[in-house]
Amino acid sequence: MSRLVKKPIPYPENVKVSYDEKEHKVTVEGPKGKLELNIHPDIKVTLNQQERWIKLDRPSDRSFHKAIHGTMAALIKNMIKGVTEGFTEILEIHGLGYRAQLKGNVLELHLGKSHPDIYPIPPDVKIEVKGNEIHIHGIDKQRVGQVAAEIRSFRKPDPYKGKGIRYKGEQLSSNPERLQVRSKEVR
């Protein structure tokens, strides 16, 4: 990660980046919205508005400073991508009679229980239901992932029958208990 942050982070013409030195806060504003990030006080931020790049510098090569340097750079890159393109997470619903539907600003999930699970949709995230898929859109990568994880937690995928809510393309291990038993026998 440290080699990636040696270069300045470029941003496109339609994105406005500003830095408040007193509050150590980077603000990224683009066509899809506005995001803010509190920068660690040890990290020095250099912003060049004419050449359209932002550079982060760390005070030392201690492992903590290297880690926080790479983390801050990755978060800023994700903010720039979020306000220009946005992020999408897709969940699939598998199971007989399992379905999801939108009712206003609430996602209603029928997942084989005696009652539907209700999930209030946060204002900074947009959710669409297409057949057996739930599409989650937003500009904040962390928020989109968090909402997807919360929806998935209503009915995690069953490794034996394959029923439940899973990420698109997620592979389930066929029999986790057997795999654990076999690994103990090998030792």
Swiss-Prot record:
Q: Name one GO molecular function term.
A: rRNA binding
InterPro entries from the UniProt entry: Ribosomal_uL6-like, Ribosomal_uL6-like_a/b-dom_sf, Ribosomal_uL6_a/b-dom, Ribosomal_uL6_bac-type, Ribosomal_uL6_CS
Keyword Cytoplasm set for record: no
Which cysteines does the record link by disulfide bonds? none
Annotated segments matching region Disordered = 159-187
GO BP, sorted A to Z: cytoplasmic translation
Please, which domain of life does this record's source organism belong to? Bacteria
GO (cellular component) term, any one: cytosolic large ribosomal subunit
Q: Which UniProt keywords apply?
A: Ribonucleoprotein, Ribosomal protein, RNA-binding, rRNA-binding
SUPFAM superfamilies tied to this protein: Ribosomal protein L6
**Function (record text):** This protein binds to the 23S rRNA, and is important in its secondary structure. It is located near the subunit interface in the base of the L7/L12 stalk, and near the tRNA binding site of the peptidyltransferase center.
Assembly with partners or alone: Part of the 50S ribosomal subunit.
**Protein name per UniProt:** Large ribosomal subunit protein uL6
Q: What is the lineage of its organism?
A: Bacteria, Pseudomonadati, Aquificota, Aquificia, Aquificales
